[in-house]
Amino acid sequence: MAGASVKVAVRVRPFNSREMSRDSKCIIQMSGSTTTIVNPKQPKETPKSFSFDYSYWSHTSPEDINYASQKQVYRDIGEEMLQHAFEGYNVCIFAYGQTGAGKSYTMMGKQEKDQQGIIPQLCEDLFSRINDTTNDNMSYSVEVSYMEIYCERVRDLLNPKNKGNLRVREHPLLGPYVEDLSKLAVTSYNDIQDLMDSGNKARTVAATNMNETSSRSHAVFNIIFTQKRHDAETNITTEKVSKISLVDLAGSERADSTGAKGTRLKEGANINKSLTTLGKVISALAEMDSGPNKNKKKKKTDFIPYRDSVLTWLLRENLGGNSRTAMVAALSPADINYDETLSTLRYADRAKQIRCNAVINEDPNNKLIRELKDEVTRLRDLLYAQGLGDITDMTNALVGMSPSSSLSALSSRAASVSSLHERILFAPGSEEAIERLKETEKIIAELNETWEEKLRRTEAIRMEREALLAEMGVAMREDGGTLGVFSPKKTPHLVNLNEDPLMSECLLYYIKDGITRVGREDGERRQDIVLSGHFIKEEHCVFRSDSRGGSEAVVTLEPCEGADTYVNGKKVTEPSILRSGNRIIMGKSHVFRFNHPEQARQERERTPCAETPAEPVDWAFAQRELLEKQGIDMKQEMEQRLQELEDQYRREREEATYLLEQQRLDYESKLEALQKQMDSRYYPEVNEEEEEPEDEVQWTERECELALWAFRKWKWYQFTSLRDLLWGNAIFLKEANAISVELKKKVQFQFVLLTDTLYSPLPPDLLPPEAAKDRETRPFPRTIVAVEVQDQKNGATHYWTLEKLRQRLDLMREMYDRAAEVPSSVIEDCDNVVTGGDPFYDRFPWFRLVGRAFVYLSNLLYPVPLVHRVAIVSEKGEVKGFLRVAVQAISADEEAPDYGSGVRQSGTAKISFDDQHFEKFQSESCPVVGMSRSGTSQEELRIVEGQGQGADVGPSADEVNNNTCSAVPPEGLLLDSSEKAALDGPLDAALDHLRLGNTFTFRVTVLQASSISAEYADIFCQFNFIHRHDEAFSTEPLKNTGRGPPLGFYHVQNIAVEVTKSFIEYIKSQPIVFEVFGHYQQHPFPPLCKDVLSPLRPSRRHFPRVMPLSKPVPATKLSTLTRPCPGPCHCKYDLLVYFEICELEANGDYIPAVVDHRGGMPCMGTFLLHQGIQRRITVTLLHETGSHIRWKEVRELVVGRIRNTPETDESLIDPNILSLNILSSGYIHPAQDDRTFYQFEAAWDSSMHNSLLLNRVTPYREKIYMTLSAYIEMENCTQPAVVTKDFCMVFYSRDAKLPASRSIRNLFGSGSLRASESNRVTGVYELSLCHVADAGSPGMQRRRRRVLDTSVAYVRGEENLAGWRPRSDSLILDHQWELEKLSLLQEVEKTRHYLLLREKLETAQRPVPEALSPAFSEDSESHGSSSASSPLSAEGRPSPLEAPNERQRELAVKCLRLLTHTFNREYTHSHVCVSASESKLSEMSVTLLRDPSMSPLGVATLTPSSTCPSLVEGRYGATDLRTPQPCSRPASPEPELLPEADSKKLPSPARATETDKEPQRLLVPDIQEIRVSPIVSKKGYLHFLEPHTSGWARRFVVVRRPYAYMYNSDKDTVERFVLNLATAQVEYSEDQQAMLKTPNTFAVCTEHRGILLQAASDKDMHDWLYAFNPLLAGTIRSKLSRRRSAQMRV
């Protein structure tokens, strides 16, 4: 056995004409035996390299030293294979590659010198070596067969008798072979050359008749080379038989790259079947011969699919069998063929791994003949045994006869044959035996045939072949042989043209003098030129050749009637004189070129300078000419065909859609019926209640107001409807993104919420059709769900409606379907041009909106000039820069100031303010004004609903602020009712310059823009009145570099207005809107996989890495928790949880294991554990003592999800979850701590997890992570609460001494703490106790909507999105935050304008209206954005002795609640805070008085009224501090809220008894771990004073909002106390400090305790105030600055 791998060579050819016309670039590089290919679509990608046995560079000319010629290819491959053949091995060479890559050139070559391919050179070299042999004892014989495999059919190219398709059979001894394939004996190279030429002619004739192309068929040229050696001494002759298979494979191109359709597509499918099977065979053989599988036993799955195609079946021995095989892969160098070339390289790379086991075929005949004779004997015995012996005798007689005698014998013995058939039918298996017998005897006869008989048979076949060609009119040589590549010198003739260049000009037909007839073989008269195939008539045409007086012969073509004959593309119906070079097409597939040598010679003599044609006159030229002359527009035909296909597709899609819709309706009806059954089963009482008639309830006027308020609220409620839109359309968004990624469109789609506000007005195309109808009745701005389209290619952002997305998605699907039929290169070419027809792109403007700014005009009422510096705010609430604008009143003839060279002077614009138009604008934008004036509650100002408990307490700041057109208008400080009362009187006397009917002129000057990012270039600004959309004033664009001085516009615009009531109202309340635009020149959009869920989070790369929050580990003993739907939140508690892992010590005690706290983040730490020691887990819960939270028992403690990474895949089922045995649980009572402590302990055997991570010593720098979940039952709760924590652990050996970390050493060194107090990990949690939602409540009914979240549905191509998901509920919460930010920015601008105007009036020593006085401003500030209209005294101050009426008390209480919500917008228990403040701080004041270090202050107490100036000081003045006592219900959905809080203030036992007797409602617990903020606002030491304590305590405080973490010292690593700043009230009073003589102090009040804190200095105290409550600190600093300015004026 001789094992050797397949020799693989690759060869790259030069560019062809098509590639040169398209300016193709070379993507192939060769160095030695290495071939490298470059991806033209991604040049930056690393080139792919392949290593082969030979890499032939034939891309350049022969002058190149690296050029590989035909000779070199043969020397490397052909000579080696020929040597193997002489050694007795089977040999195979096959060429592979796409059509036109140069396979046939490499294998066959051309007739010119040095252009012959491997086959001719190998045949010539074969006979050269035979002739050079001088050994008389050696004799050689060569036999040749030539076949073609086309569409899985085999044709014999050498024997004209074998016209049909030959059968491929398999013999148990010979293997696969072609039955009746002629093997012709040859004695010289000329014989082989003639046979190859004859075979190519036969191939050409057959291909032309059948309208085929050689590139779609495989050609196999077999040489059977026999060597006989006679040993004179022993008189024994030995033989070596070698089979040389030379294969020219069909093209490997894809159907889409050739445009194949119909029959061509079928042919391509069959070709690709052969090549695909060949690829499978090569891959399977390479897999078997690869390293890992080479020494393994052959499995049943190691199947080689040889039989899947004829080609691989016949080449079975050559592929991995008894053969020496070489493969030549032909490559195209052009970039347009990159995909096919890369496929060829990979094909060849797999082939080189195949190993063949070749053996020397020595003396095969003797053994073969013996085995065949044995088989014949066995088969005969079988037939005799079945009584069919006479059949064999008759068969032998028929086989031995000549063809003529056989026919006569058959005719004479018809009766006997029929009887034989009858006998065969009744003898099972006999027909197959006879067939095999015939087959075997035929092979025996072929093997026993002598060499002389083979030569005689070869000669007979040659004569038959030449006679057949002569009958067809093919020109012959004088000796009778066929003409090869030969051109007559005088006689006119026709040469064939073929699609395959190697088959063109292969057949030559003489046109004799006189008449030459062309037609079919079965014509009435004998035809001189015989053609066949479709559209060829029996008598097709006549060529008439006449000689005129010795001059050249004139050839005339006369078509017969009805025959399709074309000359130079024009159909010929009358005799036509032919000229040399004319193209003649007969029928549909026969293409010829007419050559007239004499005529051509005379033409050259007459016009010696005749130009050569620009392109070769070949088959393609003739076909193109035919289409042009016949007026056939292929493009139009293709479009028509495409239109028909589209219509058919549309019809079928409509039918499918209709059927799908019917099916959907059917399913929906079934689901609805099932849903009704479920509803009737689970909510029977709801249906019964609904069916019962309800009695009409008599409501009071107040109750009617509340009902009307609730109706309006729920009518415009949008939270759930927006969520339904997000859920229902998520699948469309995901599909659009998937198609965009697959088509490489560089466009991202994501949901976005848009609200119609001043900073973000909605464009008309985004408003739904019903927007105009409900605009007048809608009290709140409309919020819509839109799609944000981020065009990364052009750096543009567009907004689409959901309807537009669905429409575009249909077009995207059609584009995706069409993309499968278009080559990828064409798609990318089209992608470079953004056209209006692409559904992914929209037209984008050059300028993009940077942001908007607003300038109020109330200074024109006085009039004083003002210069504003206003913020430029984007639609997302981001401050993009600042704009300086000056507004002043001028006289009509006043000239503009001189600003130097940068002046932009505009003329005076005349604008009219129509009262009716402005009133319409006000009614459309602020429809709630009318309701407000009729006494409607201000609760109607709420915009954003649905934050659960927040809705129960009262309107939040974001709810009020978001309403940009409210009853008490949002301008607040500019237009509240109290200011109107103060303004109207003085203004009526002072508005001489604004008399009705007069012309008033004022000037708006756009001065400068600053702090605008450099990503916006060419900045310009335009401004207009807010209710006018038809015209705007614009500045000139300025270049923006982001550096240097501000951009100076200095644009002056004078505006003249006829004074009307609407104009005066406008400048009192409305601003001018300034819009800043710029050209955006960066593309900052991230890829889809980087899409963040919340744009508000800080970038995590700047902060330490934190562990992700895991979901609870599922319980093993408890039944599946069916969480009921939570209703309104009842209360919330902050939990501080300690986790300890205790290990068994030598003395029998369990000591907490050491915890490494390095990392600096709270609630983190690594347990350092010993291997193989018993352990216990201790969990301690700490929280404030409250009546609602009572722990009952620990139901289960489970641990699982053992891993070595912080992240975990929670979707997988963990088999190693372990439920721990609870050893103890209960309350503990540490000394000097009034908080509640609940502790439980469980035994943990880590070996029970059966995890290697827990059983072994942890490798260096690796950590083990585990998740713990505790299920704790609480009283009055429907289900257990779950506390979940991720542990980080490192296991050391049992006897290892753990080195204490730096933090632990510092802790021990201080001596202030025991080691056990630091060996714990903390966690901060929020416990929410919610009521169980009523099944029949509107909230439950809304939650039971059948709207499915489609974001989880699978979409084809979703895996390419790399984890991207559509935005969902979090988008609504983020948008609320954005709306609040926009509202706050708007309020800041109003307040800044108000303060600027007041300061301007004071500095100008003008009388300041009472509405702008400092005392009045304090009153306004205390009310936030809405103030009550309180009666004023003559001096303009509120009378402290005057009793407020009911409405005023309601407004005062509402203001208190609004202010507490403003400072702590997440705080939901403001009514409790008031009572807690009083009780706890009163206790603190008593403690202060008892402290001997404090001076006695008599009966002075620290009351909430004195320590909470933010609540009451602003409303009632600094001189009379008292707590408001509301005596009526507030305008709130819970009218008993505040009176109940007042009653709680009284420490009455009766009150407590009543509380105990109240029936306890079941609650739903929910515990969420709080993610610790990485941002430290402030840290340092503070002194604490709590009630019932002896004195001040010094603690280390770290503020990470919204929590403040308390430590015993700065060395302490364990959190001892946490303070939730979001629910705490921070209070500060200078008077209280002076009274108690405790400087630098402030108070923090929670629901359960009050704490007094003292800082080291005044500056330190203000820093702490800013860290605890930035808004309060800002208020204090503002008051201090006003106080200092007032003192300076005094």
Curated annotation (Swiss-Prot):
Family, similarity comment: Belongs to the TRAFAC class myosin-kinesin ATPase superfamily. Kinesin family. Unc-104 subfamily.
Query: What outcome follows a substitution of residue 157 to H?
Result: In KAND; uncertain significance
**What happens when you mutate residue 54 to D?**
In KAND; uncertain significance
Q: Protein name, please?
A: Kinesin-like protein KIF1A
Please tell me the disease that this Swiss-Prot or TrEMBL record associates with the protein. Spastic paraplegia 30A, autosomal dominant: A form of spastic paraplegia, a neurodegenerative disorder characterized by a slow, gradual, progressive weakness and spasticity of the lower limbs. Rate of progression and the severity of symptoms are quite variable. Initial symptoms may include difficulty with balance, weakness and stiffness in the legs, muscle spasms, and dragging the toes when walking. In some forms of the disorder, bladder symptoms (such as incontinence) may appear, or the weakness and stiffness may spread to other parts of the body. Spastic paraplegia 30B, autosomal recessive: A form of spastic paraplegia, a neurodegenerative disorder characterized by a slow, gradual, progressive weakness and spasticity of the lower limbs. Rate of progression and the severity of symptoms are quite variable. Initial symptoms may include difficulty with balance, weakness and stiffness in the legs, muscle spasms, and dragging the toes when walking. In some forms of the disorder, bladder symptoms (such as incontinence) may appear, or the weakness and stiffness may spread to other parts of the body.
Provide the assembly information. Dimeric motor; dimerization is required for ATP-driven processive motility. Monomer in vitro. Interacts with PPFIA1 and PPFIA4. Interacts with CALM1; the interaction is increased in presence of calcium and increases neuronal dense core vesicles motility. Interacts with PPFIA2 and TANC2; both interactions allow the recruitment of neuronal dense core vesicles to dendritic spines and decrease in presence of calcium. Interacts with SYT4 (unphosphorylated) and SYT11; both interactions increase in presence of calcium. Interacts with MADD.
Record has GTP-binding as a keyword: no
SUPFAM superfamilies in the record:
P-loop containing nucleoside triphosphate hydrolases, PH domain-like, SMAD/FHA domain
What happens upon changing residue 254 to W? Answer: In NESCAVS; affects subcellular location, binding to microtubules and motility; contrary to wild-type, does not accumulate in the distal tips of differentiated SH-SY5Y cells, but localizes closer to the cell body in transfected cells; retains its ability to move processively along microtubules, but shows reduced velocity and processivity; increased interaction with microtubules
What changing residue 316 to W does, per the record, is: In NESCAVS; affects subcellular location, binding to microtubules and motility; contrary to wild-type, does not accumulate in the distal tips of differentiated SH-SY5Y cells, but localizes closer to the cell body in transfected cells; retains its ability to move processively along microtubules, but shows reduced velocity; small decrease of interaction with microtubules
Enzyme Commission code: 5.6.1.3
Gene, per the UniProt record: KIF1A
Which stretches of sequence are listed as region Disordered? 1413-1446, 1518-1558
Q: Which Pfam families match?
A: DUF3694, FHA, KIF1B, Kinesin, Kinesin_assoc, PH
Sequence ranges assigned to domain FHA in this UniProt record: 516-572
